[in-house]
Amino acid sequence: MLCSIEKIEPLTSFIFRVLLKPDQPFEFRAGQYINVSLSFGSLPFSIASCPSNGAFLELHIGGSDISKKNTLVMEELTNSWGCGNMVEVSEARGKAWLRDESVKPLLLVAGGTGMSYTLSILKNSLAQGFNQPIYVYWGAKDMENLYVHDELVDIALENKNVSYVPVTEISTCPQYAKQGKVLECVMSDFRNLSEFDIYLCGPYKMVEVARDWFCDKRGAEPEQLYADAFAYL
């Protein structure tokens, strides 16, 4: 499928929001991803937008620091945007989508730009009228890299069933975020996770440790945890 690039905007020094418009109706579930075809290969990116807004696909591309790969991606997409060139994307992929038939409380844990996945899950849950508790934990290097922090604060204020806990490794604003590792904060705040549906997105190591800790130490069953990274662990 071909998409036009409608907008590219910086969210931090190294993270960008890319808005794509498919040239035909595009169906996906909250929590799925697409592969974007580039001159040097195809790369996966989680869809940050909600399926109810299927006219556009929002991607978050980048990281807490500069990297050669992300620089190449953004250079190519920016050039395509400037020239009006279309980009080719795959159909929606991944099996860690939101299980909207469940009434269990949700625990959403994101690391870095894993928030793109988490944001789609969260927004779709609310759009469907979920009223069970939803806990959102987001870990990043510092406050700058909590790049949709204000939006999440507003969502939590507007929805009584949503709790948002930001966590930064470097503490510059202790009044706004906990300091430490996001998984350690989850472990500190919950003694039992046996009744939760748990959605994870972030570095592979984070997801692997989360599975081990939540299952071995907090009573979660493997089938309660959802992450596309599990296919590679």
UniProtKB/Swiss-Prot annotation:
PROSITE patterns from the UniProt entry: FAD_FR
Sorted UniProt keywords: FAD, Flavoprotein, Luminescence, Oxidoreductase
Top-level taxon in the UniProt lineage: Bacteria
GO biological process: bioluminescence
EC number(s) given by UniProt: 1.-.-.-
EC supergroup of this enzyme: oxidoreductase
SUPFAM superfamilies: Ferredoxin reductase-like, C-terminal NADP-linked domain, Riboflavin synthase domain-like
UniProt keyword annotation of Lyase present: no
Coiled-coil spans in chain: none
InterPro entries: FAD-bd_FR_type, FNR_nucleotide-bd, MRET, OxRdtase_FAD/NAD-bd, Riboflavin_synthase-like_b-brl
Domain FAD-binding FR-type: 1-133
Listed GO MF terms: oxidoreductase activity
Binding site for pyridine: G111, G112, T113, G114, M115
Role of this protein: Probable flavin reductase in the luminescent systems of different marine bacteria.
Family to which this protein belongs: Belongs to the Fre/LuxG FAD/NAD(P) flavoprotein oxidoreductase family.
UniProt protein name: Probable flavin reductase
Species in which this protein is naturally found: Vibrio harveyi (Beneckea harveyi)
Lineage: Bacteria, Pseudomonadati, Pseudomonadota, Gammaproteobacteria, Vibrionales
Recorded name of the encoding gene: luxG
